[in-house]
């Protein structure tokens, strides 16, 4: 799904592929089935060098998530519905993670004042546009969360718990109360609460690491396995997975990596905390996938 050589998005694709190489090794993009441009330019080598220790620390955890046996367990429509009824909460809290980054890097208050660096503001706002108001089909603009709800309906999955949860949150209930009122599966509750705990601590570099490594770097490899095994009668889910493979491998991962570097700078302690947050995020994802496998039998 690479972009043409003369497309202005090519710089982002080059950066994203180099980012994945830095995290997982030089052959990783090819092994993941991601687009690899024939000539690598615009490489930010000093930034990638600083990612070296983080790369070594997270590589095994990334691989465990990317190659998880869960996708092979989704062998029936009922199993696929169970997966979606668990996974939708990761789709929802992805947006909370993203919006927390936007709040940390841009001014969302009135009256407005400049906050952060112009480049960081642009980076986060570009990602928010794509996730919160994507063009998912001609004439249709929606968030990826709303798209996922349509995919669940198409597949016959139960959307009432997630709708109840969102309604409770909108009404002002505490997150753990909303999760309980909605009857959210315990493993999905654990996943959401781990994300919200990280957000509430409020360390920008840790939040960005969870977003960059735990989500943006992991999603393309995870979803490639899913797309390959999907039945033909769930086209919206297939489109959702393919859209994330496209934007997260070609665009968003590179943008997120630049933000992570900006947050950590040359501070060794921040890089250490970022590494811990990334690993914790990947471990939470693995536990969620383990729970899906256990549920579908």
What do the predicted segments below correspond to?
Residues 1-37:
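N-terminal amphipathic/basic-hydrophobic helices that include classical n-h-c signal peptides
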Residues 41-297:
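Non-heme di-metal
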């Amino acid at each position: 799904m690479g972009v043409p050589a003369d497309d202005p998005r090519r710089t982002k694709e080059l950066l994203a592929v180099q980012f994945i190489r830095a995290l997982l090794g030089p052959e990783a993009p090819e092994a993941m089935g991601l687009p690899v441009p024939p000539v690598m330019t615009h490489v930010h080598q000093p930034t990638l060098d600083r990612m070296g220790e983080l790369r070594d620390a997270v590589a095994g955890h990334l691989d465990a998530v990317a190659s998880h046996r869960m996708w092979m367990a989704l062998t029936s429509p009922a199993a696929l519905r169970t997966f979606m009824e668990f996974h939708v909460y990761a789709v929802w809290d992805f947006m909370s993670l993203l919006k927390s980054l936007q709040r940390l890097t841009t001014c969302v208050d009135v009256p407005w004042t400049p906050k952060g660096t112009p480049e960081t503001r642009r980076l986060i706002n570009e990602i928010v546009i794509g996730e919160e108001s994507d063009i998912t089909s001609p004439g249709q603009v929606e968030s990826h969360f709303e798209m996922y709800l349509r995919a669940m309906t198409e597949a016959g999955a139960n959307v009432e718990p997630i709708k109840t949860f969102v309604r409770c949150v909108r009404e002002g209930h505490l997150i753990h109360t909303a999760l309980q009122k909605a009857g959210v599966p315990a493993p999905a509750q654990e996943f959401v609460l781990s994300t919200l705990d990280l957000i509430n601590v409020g360390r920008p570099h840790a939040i960005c690491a969870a977003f960059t490594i735990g989500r943006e770097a992991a999603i393309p490899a995870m979803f490639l396995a899913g797309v390959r095994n999907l039945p033909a009668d769930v086209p919206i889910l297939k489109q959702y997975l393919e859209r994330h493979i496209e934007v997260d491998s070609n665009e968003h991962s590179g943008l997120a990596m630049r933000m992570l570097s900006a947050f950590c700078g040359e501070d060794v302690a921040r890089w250490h905390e970022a590494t811990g947050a990334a690993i914790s995020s990947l471990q939470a994802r693995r536990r969620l996938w383990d729970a899906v496998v256990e549920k579908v039998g």
